[in-house]
Amino acid sequence: MDSNTVSSFQDILMRMSKMQLGSSSEDLNGMITQFESLKLYRDSLGEAVMRMGDLHSLQIRNGKWREQLSQKFEEIRWLIEEVRHRLKTTENSFEQITFMQALQLLLEVEQEIRTFSFQLI
């Protein structure tokens, strides 16, 4: 995994955790949790691709990986929509920058997961 992507995830998660969005802080915590889950999933797919010998055991052991992949894409789409909504509603420049970077990172991660999944098929 690219070290820039790791630091981008860490940076965005740290900045999002510092935000105070009033009554929607519960929603923000949910977004942070999903970001962390997405990062772990992307990392595990990347590791599976790097260890192609494990590919077949991964597919045999986990026959539901395509279903999980589909679920992750749904989560990414939900996060993208949520981040876009936050961008439209916030006037705070710190939040705007954070959510713009989060959106860019989500799009990059979506592409990486697609690339990994095509290699696994």
Curated annotation (Swiss-Prot):
Motif Nuclear export signal mapped to chain: 12-21, 85-94
Main location: virion
Miscellaneous comment as given in the Swiss-Prot or TrEMBL entry: Average number present in a viral particle is estimated to be 130-200 molecules.
Protein name in UniProt: Nuclear export protein
InterPro entries cross-referenced by the UniProt entry: Flu_NS2
This protein's UniProt keywords: Host nucleus, Host-virus interaction, Transport, Virion
A GO biological-process term: exit of virus from host cell nucleus through nuclear pore
UniProt similarity note: Belongs to the influenza viruses NEP family.
Physiological role: Mediates the nuclear export of encapsidated genomic RNAs (ribonucleoproteins, RNPs). Acts as an adapter between viral RNPs complexes and the nuclear export machinery of the cell. Possesses no intrinsic RNA-binding activity, but includes a C-terminal M1-binding domain. This domain is believed to allow recognition of RNPs bound to the protein M1.
Originating gene: NS
Gene Ontology cellular-component terms listed: host cell nucleus; virion component
A Pfam family reported for this protein in Swiss-Prot or TrEMBL: Flu_NS2
Location relative to the cell: Virion; Host nucleus
The protein's assembly and partners: Interacts with protein M1. May interact with host nucleoporin RAB/HRB and exportin XPO1/CRM1.
